Amino acid sequence: MTTILQINSAARSQGAQSTMLADELTAKLQQGNPGATVKVRSLLADALPHLDDAVLGAFFTPAEQRSAEQNAIVAKSDALIDELRSADVIVIGAPMYNFGVSSQLKTYFDWIARAGVTFRYTAQGPEGLLKGKKVYVVSARGGKHVGMPTDSQTPFLTTFLGFIGMTDVTFVYAEGLALGPDAASEALASAREAIAAV
C-alpha cells in the first residue's frame, strides 16, 4: 500500500497557495492510488524549535549518556524521520519567502538531517539513507524566478533532498501570484496543468 506524506510549510494557516496546490496534488495522487494512506504534517501547527544548545546537545550526545530531556528531543527527531522513512511519496508545499524556503521548512530539515540516521559519510563521500522515494515540491511564488539568480529555493531543495537520498524530485511552480489578478490566474492554471500531468 502506498503511503503519501504531505508536508505543509507555509507560515499562514489559511489562504496559503502552496498548501492549496499541495492539497490538489495529493488528491491527484490518491486518484491513481485509491488505497493510499495519506499523512499530512503542518509545520506551522506542529512547530519545531530552531536549533539551539539543547537540541544540538541532544543530537550529539551518545545515547547512553543522554538525559531524559535529551532523550525526548531525539525521540521527536526519530519520529519525524520514521514518518519520512515510511512514506513512498512525499509532497512538500513550499512557498518562496525572500528567495528561499520558510523558516518552518528549514527548521524541519535541521531536525531530520542527522549523520548516521538520514545520511552517512563514507570514503566515497556522503551517502543519503532515505532512498527510493518520489518527491513533489509545490512552490508558490509572488514573482517569477525559475531559471533566474533569484531562485535560490530550487537548488537548495534539490541539494538537501538529494543529500538525504531523495533524488527523484519533481517541482510544480506557481509563479507570479503577486503580479496582479491575470498573472495570478495564469500561475494557478499553469500549476494545475502540471498537477494534472502527474
Curated annotation (Swiss-Prot):
Belongs to the azoreductase type 1 family. The keyword Flavoprotein applies. Quinone reductase that provides resistance to thiol-specific stress caused by electrophilic quinones. Also exhibits azoreductase activity. Catalyzes the reductive cleavage of the azo bond in aromatic azo compounds to the corresponding amines. GO terms for molecular function: electron transfer activity; FMN binding; oxidoreductase activity, acting on NAD(P)H as acceptor; oxidoreductase activity, acting on NAD(P)H, quinone or similar compound as acceptor. It holds the Pfam family Flavodoxin_2. HAMAP family: Azoreductase_type1. Keywords: Flavoprotein, FMN, NAD, Oxidoreductase. InterPro entries: Flavodoxin_fold (IPR003680), Flavoprotein-like_sf (IPR029039), FMN-dep_NADH:Q_OxRdtase_AzoR1 (IPR050104), NADH:quinone_OxRdtase_FMN_depd (IPR023048). Its cofactor is FMN. Its EC number is 1.6.5.-, 1.7.1.17. FMN binds at residues 96-99. Homodimer. This is FMN-dependent NADH:quinone oxidoreductase. Binds 1 FMN per subunit. It catalyses: 2 a quinone + NADH + H(+) = 2 a 1,4-benzosemiquinone + NAD(+); N,N-dimethyl-1,4-phenylenediamine + anthranilate + 2 NAD(+) = 2-(4-dimethylaminophenyl)diazenylbenzoate + 2 NADH + 2 H(+).
